[in-house]
Amino acid sequence: MSLKHTIKPIFYRVGLRLLPVALFQIQHWLMHRRFGTYSYWANLHNPETFNEKLLRSKLDGDHAELTHLVDKAAVKSWVSERIGEEHIIETIGVYDDPEQVPLNNLPRHCILKPTHASGHVIILRGTEGDPTPKEILKTMKCWQRINHYHLSGEPQYRDIAPRIICEPLLGDGASDLPDYKFFCFHGEPAYIQVDIDRHSRHVRRYYDCDWQPQDFTLRYPMARREAPRPERLDRMLDIAQMLSAGFNFVRVDLYESAEQVYFGELTFHPESGTAPFSDYQKDLMLGKLLELREEHSV
């Protein structure tokens, strides 16, 4: 396991127990110093920016009801009930123990990821560049020791049982399908994030719901080229609206294939509420869209 996944959880466990506000403020400041062109000390007692309000929301309320919505296996039934089973990516298998994963009998094109964490994935494309079964097993065993709460402070991840999920790789297997991340405030989509070259030179572009490009980005550089408008944008906006109903904020991630729109995941604290905007005023702008009020039960 990497140093990040050994030292950081210890630091977080102590900080979350003793000084959670200071912990989040320090993490926010460090992320801005590392990835941004400016930095500021997050005010969590009177939050105004988008990041400040996300950080504040990690401290308040009962997040236990969100646990099944960030579990990458459990969330599928909840989403299916709301938008239809046709939008759910097939599940090849869910495994409690990495040793249970049939590494020598997996489909040629598939992905493996932990159900209980964020930002971890193994992509198998059926090429010489794929990791070996031994390497895959080693990585999955590391995943099983992760408690994402102790890496991000997001309480909805604290009590998720560690498992591995296997899904087919959408598209032609050679390249990733475009994914669209809908920033939804109080049940209404407002902005759409498009990531380009995520596994190499990662850049981003943001659009409004009419697919007009915006003059800001979050953490990663702004893409120079514009992404084409998705054919099923209207359907994706409808889906994002349905899935975000009842929440102060949630990011709804969707994929578009040649045949269908597929659900990806729900994210309640993008970048854990610490990623710098390219412009501080945009952090304030999105913050004005987010009211921290009691959320509906799900």
Short names for language-model regions:
Residues M1-D60:
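Membrane-proximal basic amphipathic "stem/tether" segments
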Residues L54, E90-D97, H109, G119, ...:
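Catalytic phosphate/metal-binding cores of nucleic-acid and nucleotide-processing enzymes, i.e., regions
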Residues D60-D62, L66-P178, H186:
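Active-site nucleotide/adenylate-binding loops and adjacent lid/helix of ATP-dependent enzymes
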Residues L112, P178-D195, R204-Y206, Y262-T267:
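Beta-strand scaffold of nucleotide-dependent catalytic cores
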Residues T115, I122, E128, I192, ...:
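C-terminal and inter-domain tail/linker signature
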Residues G126-T127, C184-E188, R198, S257-E259:
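Short acidic-glycine loop/turn motifs at beta-strand connectors
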Residues D159-R163, Y206-V261:
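A long amphipathic alpha-helix within ATP-dependent nucleotide-binding catalytic cores
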Residues E256-V298:
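C-terminal active-site "lid" helix and adjoining low-complexity regulatory extension at the edge
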